[in-house]
From Swiss-Prot:
Key words, A-Z: Ribonucleoprotein, Ribosomal protein
General function of this protein: Forms part of the ribosomal stalk which helps the ribosome interact with GTP-bound translation factors. Is thus essential for accurate translation.
SUPFAM superfamilies, alphabetized: ClpS-like, Ribosomal protein L7/12, oligomerisation (N-terminal) domain
Protein name: Large ribosomal subunit protein bL12
Gene name of the record: rplL
Length: 137
C-alpha cells in the first residue's frame, strides 16, 4: 500500500474543513502552476510530474446551493392600475381590503415570501398582468 508518510498526508487531508481544503487547492495551484478545474472534454488530464494512478490531493468541490425559496416584490404601482393590482394582491395574499391597500401603497414591498419558483413566477405574472412592476428575489 502507501508509505507511512503518504498515509499521514491522506489522514490530514480527510480532517480538513471545506474552507481549509479550498485554501489548500489555491496554494497547490500557486506553488505548482496548475489549475484544479475539470477538463472540458471530460477526459483525464495528467499534471506534469504526476504518474497516472497515483493518489491525488484534490479538495471536494463546493456544491452550489440552488435557491428554493423566493420572495415576490411589488416594485411599482401605476396610479391608473391601482385598483386592479389591489384585487390581485388580495387574491394572492388573502389580506383584507385595508391591509392590501396598505401593501400596494407601500411599494416597493414584498407581496409573498418563501414561495417556490413556480408559484413565484405565477404571482409575478398575475401582478404584471394587472399593470404592476414586480420582481422575484
Amino acid at each position: 500500500m502507501a508509505s507511512e508518510r503518504v498515509e499521514k498526508i491522506l489522514e490530514d487531508l480527510k480532517a480538513l474543513s471545506l474552507l481549509e481544503a479550498a485554501e489548500l487547492v489555491k496554494g497547490i495551484e500557486e506553488v505548482f502552476g496548475v489549475k484544479a478545474e475539470a477538463p472540458a472534454g471530460g477526459g483525464m488530464m495528467v499534471m506534469p510530474g504526476v504518474m497516472p494512478g497515483a493518489p491525488a490531493a484534490a479538495a471536494p468541490a463546493e456544491p452550489v446551493e440552488e435557491q428554493t425559496e423566493f420572495t415576490v416584490m411589488l416594485e411599482e404601482v401605476p396610479a391608473d392600475k391601482k385598483i386592479a393590482i389591489l384585487k390581485v394582491a388580495r387574491e394572492i395574499t388573502g389580506l383584507g381590503l385595508k391591509e392590501a391597500k396598505d401593501l400596494v401603497e407601500a411599494a416597493p414591498k414584498a407581496v409573498k415570501e418563501g414561495v417556490n419558483k413556480d408559484d413565484a413566477a405565477t404571482i409575478k405574472k398575475k401582478l404584471e398582468e394587472a399593470g404592476a412592476k414586480a420582481s422575484i428575489k
